[in-house]
């Protein structure tokens, strides 16, 4: 039986998590968001909170850290100190590959589109929306005060873009990297699930 793997990348406030959960329910397959974080925390020994927030702190990449490799005083062998954000990414990537190998799933965020880019059963979706609509959702549905919502939207989207660029070399939200791009301000949540 063919697997159905759907990855969902999304702008903050576009309703991606809700859409992912509803889509998975409609298809009768599991949805992974927080579970990726929990499993990656187990594998890496890092806290789930650190892994969950790593996108906002993405300032360096594995390739940068390779250039910072140092010799230890105990051995003449070159050793690499892997930055914690890189360790978190690698742990999440391993979990995402395991999920996809196990069977059908909806996987939200975490560069899953890039990690599974060569999987023939994967469909990659990017969800975006009009700024005002996303702000409304952040305020009304997430319960964030208006002024804080504006700053959160800016910071989280910037963090996601930096994180994506750091680990994929590509531009987050670039339509050429996805199979489907939907403006949830136009489709609404039910329309996005139906699409």
Question: What do the predicted segments below correspond to?
Answer:
Residues 2-5:
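Extreme N-terminal starter segment of soluble prokaryotic enzymes
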Residues 8-24:
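Glycine-rich phosphate-binding P-loop
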Residues 30-41:
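Short beta-strand-centered segment that lines the nucleotide-binding/catalytic pocket of NTP-utilizing
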Residues 56, 61-66, 71, 145-190:
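Small-molecule kinase domains that catalyze NTP-dependent phosphoryl transfer to phosphate-bearing small molecules
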Residues 99, 111-119, 137:
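RNA pseudouridine synthases
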């Amino acid at each position: 039986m063919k697997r159905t793997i759907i990855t969902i990348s999304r702008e903050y406030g576009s309703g991606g998590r809700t859409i992912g959960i509803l889509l998975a329910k409609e298809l009768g397959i599991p949805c992974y968001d927080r579970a990726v974080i929990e499993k990656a925390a187990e594998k890496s020994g890092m806290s789930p909170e650190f892994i969950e927030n790593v996108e906002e702190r993405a300032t360096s990449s594995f390739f940068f850290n390779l250039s910072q490799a140092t010799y230890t005083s105990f051995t003449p062998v070159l050793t690499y100190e892997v930055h914690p954000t890189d360790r978190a990414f690698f742990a999440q990537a391993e979990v995402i590959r395991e999920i996809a190998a196990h069977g059908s799933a909806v996987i939200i965020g975490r560069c899953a589109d890039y990690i599974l880019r060569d999987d023939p059963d994967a469909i990659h979706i990017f969800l975006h929306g009009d700024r005002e609509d996303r702000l409304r959702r952040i305020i009304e549905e997430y319960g964030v005060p208006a002024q804080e919502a504006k700053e959160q939207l800016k910071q989280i989207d910037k963090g996601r873009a930096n994180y994506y660029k750091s680990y994929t070399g590509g531009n987050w939200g670039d339509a050429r990297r996805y199979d489907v791009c939907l403006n949830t301000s136009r489709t609404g949540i039910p329309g996005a699930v139906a699409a």
